[in-house]
Every structure is written in structure tokens, then in C-alpha cells.
């Protein structure tokens, strides 16, 4: 035992004679109600133990990332990190090692008592020290889970990027666990992770399932994305049944919502909203039905509903299920239908903040059926549009897999419904740079243009996709670290209300960073021509929105054309005279007239796509 430790320990003993433990005034239950966005006390310690190189730190940080992404407050205490601060006065003698683990156990207990899931990753080689850590928690009435991260010594040595095992075998490091100091394997751990046989994600899932069994992690966290497709082995049977059922004709807009629901973008919805879900969305911007308070808040800011006429309601009201038919083809079954009044003005006023029928989406609502029908969906097959772009329509599960295949450790999403200019690219490049500076190794950009219904004067999807391809071809964005995919949602032009929907869908698809621009999902008021929504409110609302805590919001820095640099640049008010703000209206006017924008505004090939589009309009007209 070191002399410093003995001196400090003796001094601590002398001070402790007149110290009285003070009880908290706030109970754990009350603390649990306000810690994180998922109410309920879930304080505990997950104690990872194993040889150096077994994978403790990797699993610890991956588990922390998983829990935080599901809005469960947690913190990871790493052995090396703690020895840089709290325990920097301790060495590696037997006494110092014992004190190292004791201190960590006490700190972990405080974290757990505060309502966090505390994850510790320490070799902690001796059984008596780990047992003492358990007793510290159990005496305080706090759960303690010992997780043995088990990997053979030769595997640990092969992973030794620091060269510690090599130095220990050379005699340069004395008392190194596994070489000349014993590691006492846990006899009855709560979980054993075989890291030489299982992937990191599999190991994390094992721990999550343990926490689920102990009611630390809610069941809803594990269920993941809800796709609504009929299982392959039952498609023929359900399709045959669909042919015998009454049918409801649906519009292209309705089919786009069927696609959204079936692919899991609206998880946990099981179909078009029934009245209870509709009212929750309309009045609270959240889904509460069937979710107990400890399972937290599910953000849902827009109603996903199926309008029907009074005649169709009268015809189908007594059915337990019926088929949805698009252009003569039965695409899905709707089960246990519930019909309720479509109060259009109220819906529009709450979603859009206005009910003017001159708004393009509100116009469609006002012209739709006077009734809504909700019910569970069984979708017979994946929705395909056969427009040459289906390969870009990746589902949330496919996007998650693609990010995994690219070894992404951060995914930042950019939602757009317009062509990409170099100002957009500057923001995406800057976001990537900042993520690399923060220590991420493989940040991936999800360039995710909206592919559902848009208003008539927006550039059509096929031309936008050509333009995005040209941007990548000219390497304005890095093709190797970019996923271009189509987000199948229709556009509502509902400003801050809609931008929450856009963000939560990307969150479901695995994004953990979301770039929000000026006036997202906004448009000019159809009557006054002023901004329908205050341009900065979208970003502000996203930063406060309930249920979106697993996504970090990246505000859109204002970019404009720098006349001196002849390039897009972040706007500096102190140099206002250097900048030219090229509006979308001006950009479209230049493209329509076949003129070139200033050098550096947009990649030349991408600009040519835009001018080709407007020329095609002239020919059509």
C-alpha cells in the first residue's frame, strides 16, 4: 500500500468521527419522475468486469449510447478515465487496487441513487472487492448487476492496441492482471458476455434484456421498429381473404400514408389512427395510449388518418375488416375499424394554425371525406411506385442496416425538398467536420429528400434525385460517407408541428443528429404572402420537443454567397456587404431563364439538371 494512501486514509479516519449521514428530502420515486423523459426510478449499477482487452469499455460505451438513444438516463465510468481524476493518487498495489474499486463503488452508488443507470468498466480482478461493491449497493437498496466480460487471454492479447500485455510479458509492467497477477472469475454473475463469440450489439442486447427482466429498461424500448407487412408465409392466405372482403378505394395520398405506416416510420402505430390516438396527437403532439408513464413520451405531432365519405361509412360500418384498394389493386386489410367525425376546421387549425383553403394541403383536407376511419393494417406487399426510384426508398430497418454496414458511429440527417446548393453542402461538410472533432470516426450523412406529395411549384422528386446525384458526382459531398435515400412521407407545410414529425422519423431510422434549417416545413401564407411561421421557431421547437431526446439538433447556420471568396460562406453580420442572399425565387428565375448563377453557388452539373427541368416545363407548356 502506498505511503500517500496510508496518510490520506488515516486523515480521513480522523475526520469521520463527527460526520452524520443526512437523509435526502426528495424520494427516489420523486426523483425518478423528473430524471430523463421516461418517468420512473431506474437507478442501478451495471458492473462490467474482465481482463484488459476483453471489451469492457467498448460494451460500456455502446450500452450507454443505446440507453441514451432510448431516453434512459445513464453514465459510464471507465477505469482509465477515473484514474485521470478521482483516483489519480492511487497506484496498482493490492491496497490501492482495493481502494480504487471501493471509491468507484461509492461513486456508482451515488449515480444510481440519483436515478441513473451507472455503467462501470473496471478489471476489478478480485472477488472480495466486487462483493464489497455489491454490498455497498444492496445496503442502500439499489440493484447491482455483475457482468462478466469473458474473453480468452490470447484474444485479449491480440486486441492489445496499447501494447500492455507485451510490456507485461517483457517484465516492464509488474503485477499485470492475467500475466503475473490473478484474475478471479465471477462465480455467479448476472450475465456472461462471450466477446470472442458475440458482436458488440449482441452483447449490448444481452445486457438490455437483463435490465428489461429487472424492469430497469421498459419492454417498449426493445421492440424496435413496427413494420406492418403480412408475414411471407401468410401472404397468399391473406390476399385470398382480401379478395372476398368489401373494399375501400383510396387515393395516392392515402397510399403514401400506407407506405409510411407499413415500413415502420410511424412506430408504434399499428395502422391509421383511431379517435383516441387522433385526439392525443391533435391536442398533445404525443401518443399516450397503451403506454404507462414510466415508458415515457412518444412524439407524434401530425395525425395519420384515413378520410372516408358518408356513403363509404354507411357501407362499411358493420364490417370487422375490409380491403384498401388502390387503382383496382387490393394493397392492405384494415381490421377492427372505428369511424369518427372528421372535424376538418378543428384539425387544420390545430395542425397548421390556420384553416385557409388556399393552403395546398389544407385544400386537400377540406375536399376529403367527412368521416375518418382508424384500424390496424395488414399490408400485403411493399409499396412500389415503379418510377425508377424504388431502390432509393429504404425502410428504417434497411437504413439502420446500411449504416451498420458502413461502420457508422454517428448518423446526421438532412431533410430537404429542394435542390442542394453549395450553402447546404457547406453546412453538411461543417457538421461532419465537427463530429470528427468530437471523436467520431465514421460519421455518415443521410441525405434524405422528401418523396411523397409536394405542392405543384416544388421541383419534382425525379429531378431532385438527378440533381442530388450530380452533387455527389462532382464530389461536393463525399459519396463514400453519404447515403442518399427517399423519405416517403407526404409534405404538409405545417412548420414547427411538421418538423417534429420529420425529426422523429429520422430518429427511428437510426439518426442521432438532425440538421434543422431556417423555416423548416414552412411556406408563405397563401393570402398575405408573409412567412406562415416564424422562421426560427422550427429549430427552437425541436430543441424542446418531448420524445426527441435521442437526437441532437444541429441548428442551420445561415449561409450566403460571399462575393469576395466567390463561394458559399457562413454569414458574418460584421461583413454584411460581402454577402449576397440568393433566394429560392431568384434561383428558380435564373434557372428558368437559362442563366448561370454566380461561380461557387452550385456545382455546374447540378445546376444543369435544374435548368434542364425548367426547360422541360417550357416544352410541356
UniProtKB/Swiss-Prot annotation:
Positions with a binding annotation for ATP 1: 53-58, 198
GO molecular function, one term: nucleotidyltransferase activity
Region feature Adenylyl-sulfate kinase, mapped onto this chain: 1-216
Amino-acid positions noted as binding ATP 2 in the UniProt annotation, renumbered to this chain: 415-418, 517-521, 559
Binding positions (adenosine 5'-phosphosulfate): 80-83, 92, 97-100, 123-124, 162, 175-176
Pathway the protein acts in: Sulfur metabolism; sulfate assimilation
Gene3D superfamilies xrefs: HUPs, P-loop containing nucleotide triphosphate hydrolases, Sulfate adenylyltransferase
UniProt-listed GO biological process terms: 3'-phosphoadenosine 5'-phosphosulfate biosynthetic process; blood coagulation; bone development; sulfate assimilation
Pfam families linked to this entry: APS_kinase, ATP-sulfurylase, PUA_2
E.C. no: 2.7.7.4, 2.7.1.25
Tissue expression as described in the entry: Expressed in liver, cartilage, skin and brain.
GO cellular component, one term: cytosol
Region feature (Sulfate adenylyltransferase): 225-621
Keyword line: ATP-binding, Disease variant, Kinase, Multifunctional enzyme, Nucleotide-binding, Nucleotidyltransferase, Transferase
Disorder noted: Defects in Papss2 are the cause of brachymorphism (bm), a autosomal recessive disease, which is characterized by abnormal hepatic detoxification, bleeding times and postnatal growth, such as dome-shaped skull, short thick tail, and shortened but not widened limbs. The abnormal postnatal growth has been attributed to undersulfation of cartilage proteoglycans.
Name of the protein in its database record: Bifunctional 3'-phosphoadenosine 5'-phosphosulfate synthase 2
Gene: Papss2
Amino acid at each position: 500500500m502506498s505511503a500517500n494512501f496510508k496518510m490520506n486514509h488515516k486523515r480521513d479516519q480522523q475526520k469521520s468521527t463527527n460526520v452524520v449521514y443526512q437523509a435526502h428530502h426528495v424520494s427516489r420515486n420523486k426523483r425518478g419522475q423528473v430524471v430523463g423523459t421516461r418517468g420512473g426510478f431506474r437507478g442501478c449499477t451495471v458492473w462490467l468486469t474482465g481482463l484488459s482487452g476483453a471489451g469492457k469499455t467498448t460494451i460500456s460505451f455502446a450500452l450507454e449510447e443505446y440507453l441514451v438513444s432510448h431516453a434512459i438516463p445513464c453514465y459510464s465510468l471507465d477505469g482509465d478515465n477515473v484514474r485521470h481524476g478521482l483516483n489519480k493518487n492511487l497506484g496498482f498495489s493490492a491496497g490501492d487496487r482495493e481502494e480504487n474499486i471501493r471509491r468507484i463503488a461509492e461513486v456508482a452508488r451515488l449515480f444510481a441513487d440519483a436515478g441513473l443507470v451507472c455503467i462501470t468498466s473496471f478489471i476489478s480482478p478480485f472477488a472480495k472487492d466486487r462483493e464489497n461493491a455489491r454490498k455497498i449497493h444492496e445496503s442502500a437498496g439499489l440493484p447491482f448487476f455483475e457482468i462478466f466480460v469473458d474473453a480468452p487471454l490470447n484474444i485479449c492479447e491480440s486486441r492489445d492496441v496499447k501494447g500492455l500485455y507485451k510490456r507485461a510479458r517483457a517484465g516492464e509492467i509488474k503485477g499485470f492482471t492475467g500475466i503475473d497477477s490473478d484474475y478471479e472469475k465471477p462465480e455467479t454473475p448476472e450475465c456472461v458476455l462471450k466477446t470472442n463469440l458475440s458482436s458488440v450489439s449482441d452483447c449490448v442486447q444481452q445486457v438490455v434484456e437483463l435490465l428489461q427482466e429487472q424492469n430497469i429498461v421498459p419492454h417498449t424500448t426493445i421492440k424496435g421498429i413496427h413494420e406492418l407487412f403480412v408475414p411471407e408465409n401468410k401472404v397468399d392466405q391473406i390476399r385470398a381473404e382480401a379478395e372476398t372482403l368489401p373494399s375501400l378505394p383510396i387515393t395516392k395520398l392515402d397510399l403514401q400514408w400506407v407506405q409510411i405506416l407499413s415500413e415502420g416510420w410511424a412506430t408504434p402505430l399499428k395502422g391509421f389512427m383511431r379517435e383516441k390516438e387522433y385526439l392525443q396527437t391533435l391536442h398533445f403532439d404525443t401518443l399516450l395510449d397503451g403506454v404507462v408513464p414510466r415508458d415515457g413520451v412518444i412524439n407524434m405531432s401530425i395525425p395519420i388518418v384515413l378520410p372516408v365519405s358518408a356513403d363509404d361509412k354507411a357501407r362499411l360500418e358493420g364490417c370487422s375488416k375490409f380491403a384498401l384498394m388502390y387503382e383496382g389493386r387490393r394493397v392492405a386489410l384494415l381490421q377492427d375499424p372505428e369511424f369518427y367525425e372528421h372535424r376538418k376546421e378543428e384539425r387544420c387549425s390545430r395542425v397548421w394554425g390556420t384553416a385557409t383553403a388556399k393552403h395546398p394541403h389544407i385544400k386537400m383536407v377540406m375536399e376529403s371525406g367527412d368521416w375518418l376511419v382508424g384500424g390496424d393494417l395488414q399490408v400485403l406487399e411493399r409499396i412500389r411506385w415503379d418510377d425508377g426510384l424504388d431502390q432509393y426508398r429504404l425502410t428504417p430497418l434497411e437504413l439502420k442496416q446500411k449504416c451498420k454496414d458502413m461502420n457508422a458511429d454517428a448518423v446526421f440527417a438532412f431533410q430537404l425538398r429542394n435542390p442542394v446548393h453549395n450553402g447546404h453542402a457547406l453546412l453538411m461538410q461543417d457538421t461532419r467536420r465537427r463530429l470528427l472533432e468530437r471523436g467520431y470516426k465514421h460519421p455518415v450523412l443521410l441525405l434524405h429528400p422528401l418523396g411523397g406529395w409536394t405542392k405543384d411549384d416544388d421541383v419534382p422528386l425525379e429531378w431532385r434525385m438527378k440533381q442530388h446525384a450530380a452533387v455527389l458526382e462532382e464530389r461536393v459531398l463525399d459519396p463514400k460517407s453519404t447515403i442518399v435515400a427517399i423519405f416517403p412521407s407526404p409534405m404538409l407545410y405545417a412548420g414547427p408541428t411538421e418538423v417534429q414529425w420529420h425529426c422523429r422519423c429520422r430518429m427511428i431510422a437510426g439518426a442521432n443528429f438532425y440538421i434543422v434549417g431556417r423555416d423548416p416545413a414552412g411556406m408563405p401564407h397563401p393570402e398575405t404572402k408573409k412567412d406562415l411561421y416564424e422562421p426560427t421557431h422550427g429549430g427552437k421547437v425541436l430543441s424542446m420537443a418531448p420524445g426527441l431526446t435521442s437526437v441532437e439538433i444541429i441548428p442551420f447556420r445561415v449561409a450566403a454567397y460571399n462575393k469576395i471568396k466567390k463561394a458559399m460562406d457562413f454569414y458574418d453580420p460584421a461583413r454584411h456587404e460581402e454577402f449576397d442572399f440568393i433566394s429560392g425565387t431568384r434561383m428558380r428565375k435564373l434557372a428558368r431563364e437559362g442563366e448561370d448563377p454566380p461561380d461557387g453557388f452550385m456545382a455546374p452539373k447540378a445546376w444543369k439538371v435544374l435548368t434542364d427541368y425548367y426547360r422541360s416545363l417550357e416544352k410541356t407548356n
